[in-house]
Every structure is written in C-alpha cells, then in structure tokens.
Amino acid sequence: ASDVYKRQGIGSRFGGGIKQLEKMGPNGEIIMDYSIYDAVEAGFDKVVFIIRKDIEADFKEIIGNRIGKQVEVDYVFQDINDIPEGFIVPEGRTKPWGTGQAVLCCKGVVKEPFLVINADDYYGRHAFQTIYDYLTTHEDDDKYRYTMVAYRLKNTVTDNGHVARGICGLNASNELVSVTERTRIEKRNNGIEYSEDDGQTWNEIDPDTLVSMNMWGFTRSILEEIKTGFPAFLEKGLKENPLKCEYFLPAVVSDLLAEDRAAVKVLESEDKWHGVTYKEDKPVVVEAIQSLKDSGLYPQHLWD
C-alpha cells in the first residue's frame, strides 16, 4: 500500500500564525485532519509530515499526536543546510530550497508509491480514492508512470483576492504535457481572468480549465530524479538568485516530460477545492466542512 505525505510551507499572504495549523473544525480539527482521514479511507497506510524542526513540538501537539494513534506516522525535517556536497548555503539566505528538496527529505522513509499534497488544501474524498486506485494498479515501464489530480479552475478560486494556479496542458490520452504557472488569477466581470503584469491588463480564461493543486502521485523513481537534478539546479540558481531560488517539484516533472522519460496521467476531480489563501477565506471553509459533516461524509468527531 502506498504512502501519503504532506509538505508544510509557510504562507506569506495569510496574516499571522502558521496557516496550516489554523483550526477549522468544531473540535479543533485542521484541514490536514480531513485530508488524512480521506487518505486512510482510500487505502493509504502511512503519513509522512515534512516540517521545519522548529515547529515540531507545536505540530505534534496540534495534529501529529492524534494522527499517530490512527495511522503510521513519520516526520522528516526540511533543512536549508541539507544540500549536495560541494555547495555552500549563501550568506543571508533563510528560505529552504523549495518543494523538490522537501520531497527529497523523504527518501529514507518512503519505500513505495506515494502521494504528495499541500498541508493546507482541502482536496475532497474523491481525489484520494482516484489517485490511490491509480498508484496501486500502475508501475514504471518504459517510462515512469506518475499521476496528478486536476481541478476545474472555477472550483479553486476565492472571492477574497487573487490566487496562483498551475494551468494544465493535456494530450489526447489525458496525460500532462505542460503546467503553466499563472500567478494572478481572480474572479472579475462575471468570469475568471488572469494578469501577467500585476493587474494592468487582464485576459479571460475558461472557468473549466484544469489546474494543478499540487496533488501528485509518484513511484519512488522520482526521488532519484530529484536527487540527480539538485546539483544542476544549484549551479544555475546560486548564480541567478542566491537568496530566493527554489527547486520546485513541478519543474523536475516538466524536465522528465520534456525528455519523454515520464508520463503523468491527469485524473480529474469534480470536487470543490477548499483552502485558506486569505484570512477572509476561513469562515467559508469552516462552513463547507460543517456541511460535509452534516451530509454524513465525515463523522462529527473524526478520530473518536
């Protein structure tokens, strides 16, 4: 059975506190509780949390300890100093090395196909089941066989500001061809529009466009690929933007696609995504989760 794991980033647009640990449910649940519940229901049997060492105690108190009673849990720590031999962390750099490095931290504890998700996104039951079913019925052959769950753009926007989304390009076999990052998408003029110049000009975009919410299914082969690509990334990044450059997971996938060494099956979810990009999003998410409980999808007390 496959592993699930989560990565923890710290949100810059959400004022104050660690937004991934913000309480959303009536009994102190956070978004992650629901994701883990859905993952376990789907068949996943292990959770790996990728966190910063300095939040370990808070993290265990808020969620880790109660999850540990339900499913096997591992912790790995993303550390800025954990880089390949021959490289030095630039003076003044405080930012870790991005989602690629985060996933690489799991190399020692992940032994089978696994799922990567954001800690602060609510993905919905269907997404976990679909990705579990794919991971347990496919393995690498002449290509790495990866997968991702995509959402309709209209199901992933907020009324409270702009969002960044990865727009998916697909081929006829529903495999990923490209992910184009659009960093400013918002609801405007009764539709959805994006801007590439900080809001000076806007372009319409189809609300049914498929977007990535960073829900990826991988075989262990990705871990070797991330490791192999890290030095080349640092070589370039440290010259161009030493304090801010990040080794992004989707960039590793894009390179493998460009070299025709991987195929990424795009699975669709019709579920509505929920997340807290802005403080004002919180009541909407709290209400959505309560109505899912009322409909019977979740018990009122998740882990009792």
Can you annotate each of these PLM segments?
Residues 1-5:
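Short, small-residue-biased leader/transition segments that mark boundaries at the very start
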Residues 11, 122-124:
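A short, conserved beta-strand element in the Rossmann-like catalytic core
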Residues 19-34:
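Short catalytic helix/loop segments, enriched in acidic residues and glycine
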Residues 30-49, 61-62:
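A short, N-terminal amphipathic alpha-helix
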Residues 67-113:
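Short phosphate-binding loop-to-helix
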Residues 112-122:
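Short beta-strand-to-loop acidic/aromatic patch adjacent to the donor-nucleotide binding site
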Residues 125-215, 220:
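Conserved core of the sugar-phosphate nucleotidyltransferase
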Residues 226-261:
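A C-terminal functional module that forms or caps the active site or interfaces directly
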